[in-house]
């Protein structure tokens, strides 16, 4: 397991797993290729793994940096039902 400040998830091979802790939640993400993911960790939106699209991470102004998850930024993803989710700030990122 590798801890990182930033992860460029688009360069990870399909099947790669990320563990992302935010101030409020612990997310487990399986990379399916490109922006496609399977994610769990939110008790309402994704209590069990669901497919979605990872959009990147945003700064405090809401500007999204596509393709990257960054510590101190907010994780942005869209679930298959097209529900957009923005998390609290990322506190740690682990590539498993």
Question: Where are each of the predicted segments found?
Answer:
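Cysteine-centric segments in proteins
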Residues: 1-17, 21-22, 26-96
């Amino acid at each position: 397991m590798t801890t990182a400040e930033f992860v460029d998830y688009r360069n990870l091979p399909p099947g790669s797993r990320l563990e992302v802790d935010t101030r409020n939640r612990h997310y487990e993400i399986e990379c399916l290729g490109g922006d496609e993911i399977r994610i769990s960790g939110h008790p309402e939106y994704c209590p069990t793994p669901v497919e979605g699209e990872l959009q990147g991470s945003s700064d405090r102004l809401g500007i999204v940096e596509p393709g990257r998850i960054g510590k101190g930024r907010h994780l942005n993803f869209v679930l298959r039902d097209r529900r957009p989710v923005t998390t609290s700030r990322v506190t740690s990122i682990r590539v498993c």
